[in-house]
Swiss-Prot record:
Binds 1 Mg(2+) ion per subunit. May bind a second metal ion at a regulatory site, or after substrate binding. Monomer. Its cofactor is Mg(2+). It comes from Polynucleobacter asymbioticus (strain DSM 18221 / CIP 109841 / QLW-P1DMWA-1) (Polynucleobacter necessarius subsp. asymbioticus). Mg(2+) 1 binds at D18, E56, D78. Its EC number is 3.1.26.4. It is an enzyme of class 3 (hydrolase). Endonuclease that specifically degrades the RNA of RNA-DNA hybrids. This is Ribonuclease H. Transmembrane segments: none annotated.
Length: 154
């Protein structure tokens, strides 16, 4: 699966994603920051009962769904689960019928399968950033994810 950048004929979008959960499982939220030139869009959402990893994947799914056209995407996540899932594990999971190397069912397969359908629509370079380390894009995505959590707190 190619993860290089598209020629300049496609818009260049920088995306920062994050997921959060109060309890794991518990109320969770996801957030994403999408930047194109001087334009910036913030999106967030959540679920009443979920896990942090599910929210991390949802952040990427909803960010990619928010793109209106094929784009060259630079995607930043603080989730090694998401970054490695896409760049290292996904192809093997598909070849094994959504089983891990140890023959166990892939956790969150429903979301991984949905994400997999979106990947061919864009040329994405995947980047990991250390969370809660002062990176402005990641901090903003984290704040949006926590806003998503708050909407589902009792």
């Amino acid at each position: 699966m190619p993860h290089s950048k598209h020629p300049s004929s496609h818009p260049h979008i920088i995306i920062y994603t994050d997921g959060a959960c109060k309890g794991n499982p518990g109320p969770g939220g996801w957030g994403a920051v999408l930047r194109s030139g001087s334009h910036e869009k913030h999106i967030h959402g959540g679920e009443k009962l979920t896990t942090n990893n599910r929210m991390e994947i949802c952040a990427v799914i909803f960010a990619l769904k928010a793109l209106k056209q094929r784009s060259s995407v630079e995607l930043w996540t603080d989730s090694q689960y998401v970054q490695k899932g896409v760049t290292e594990w996904l192809e093997g999971w598909k070849k094994r019928g959504w089983k891990t190397a140890s023959k166990d069912p892939v956790k969150n397969a429903d979301l991984w399968q949905e994400l997999d359908t979106l990947l061919p629509d864009h040329d994405i370079s995947w980047h990991w950033v250390r969370g809660h380390n002062g990176h402005p894009g990641n901090e903003l995505a984290d704040a949006l994810a926590n806003k998503g959590v708050e909407e589902f707190l009792p």
